[in-house]
Regions:
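Helix-rich catalytic cores of soluble enzyme domains
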Residues: 2-189
Length: 189
């Protein structure tokens, strides 16, 4: 309800007193009834992704869902260069119904990706484009958002080093590549 916030995300608060098998339903219902902001749906299991899309159809109707993106899923690749069953199933559910998917390669340079900024950016774009191509097999023209979470790590301690200049440079580079590819961009950090 704040004018400064444009999106509700998905897990605003994890209701740990609700069984895991039903938790996503309560979180979705809360977003749908207590907020006027767009939000993400569940992606952790195919059935939860399906529940998210089905609940969105109850709210918006089948015709609106056929012609509009009313809910999106946010998935991560398993760097380096791996897309697991959970991600592929979520992509099939959302994109198969014409709904959007945000793909965010999560890469800590030096751990799950190359040390250099340019090589990490190349890996992130390759992983995201792999999922983009797969999403279009589910439904040609399905909405796709290029995501990015590139950070660095201390090669001395192995600890993530948030706030370093390399991730900012990566965001700029991926932003330019997203613009060239004609894709909307979501960056973390």
């Amino acid at each position: 309800l704040s004018p400064a916030l444009h999106h509700g995300g998905f897990v605003t608060c994890e209701p740990c007193d609700v069984p895991v098998s039903k938790r996503h339903l309560d979180m979705l219902l809360t977003h749908m009834t207590l907020s006027d902001k767009p939000h993400l749906g569940a992606i952790t299991e195919m059935s939860r992704a399906q529940d998210s899309v089905d609940m969105a159809e109850i709210i918006f109707g089948q015709d609106a869902m056929e012609n509009n993106c009313v809910i999106m899923g946010n998935v991560n690749t398993n760097s380096p260069l791996l897309v697991d069953k959970v991600v592929t199933q979520a992509v099939r559910v959302y994109c198969g119904r014409g709904q959007g998917i945000v793909v965010v390669p999560f890469i800590l340079s030096g751990a799950m990706g190359p040390v250099s900024t340019a090589a990490s950016v190349a890996q992130a774009v390759a992983e995201a484009m792999m999922v983009c191509a797969y999403s279009q097999l589910g439904r040609n023209g399905a909405p796709f958002v290029l995501g990015n979470f590139l950070s660095s790590m201390s090669l001395k301690s192995g600890a993530p080093t948030f706030g370093m200049p390399e991730p900012v440079i990566s965001n700029y580079a991926i932003g330019q590549l997203a613009r060239r590819l004609g894709l909307p961009l979501r960056c973390a950090g």
